[in-house]
């Protein structure tokens, strides 16, 4: 048998959704990419369980802390705002940025046999992540795929969910 779903009304705002609910309840979240009527996108992170609300709130808190740590390093932290609904629910709202991940750029260097380009990017990465390394906050997931290089060459940390005080 076949099944069909027909949606009527305005187009849904959510264009992508990922559930990260294979984690402990205190870290279970849903990440949505939304697009408004003008085509502007944003990323929203919601707690998937009541226990994960603090984890979502920490994304906002660590945006500020990482911004202080990496200020002047050339590594920008994707802006985050915290929203609350009338029922007290929380949501972290991040910019939707476009560009290429550092992972894609490094892979391309390897595919093209560009060892010099690879080394240059890797050393720049090391310089940026070591900046103020004694600062009492660390992102344990500061991987190549979480750094987006935009069309103007700016390095942006787009996901810093796994940041903790040291």
Language-model region placement:
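Conserved structural core of kinase catalytic domains
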Residues: 77-122
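Rossmann-like AdoMet/SAM-dependent catalytic core
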Residues: 1-34
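Catalytic activation segment of kinase domains across protein kinase-like and atypical kinase folds
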Residues: 136-166
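Conserved kinase catalytic-core helix
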Residues: 62-72, 109-140, 145
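Short, solvent-exposed loop/turn segments at secondary-structure junctions
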Residues: 11-12, 48-51, 83-87, 97-102, ...
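Hydrophobic residues embedded in beta-strands of well-ordered beta-sheets
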Residues: 41-42, 90, 153-155
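ATP-binding glycine-rich loop module of kinase domains
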Residues: 25-67
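Short, ordered beta-strand-loop transition motifs
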Residues: 35-38, 82-88, 151
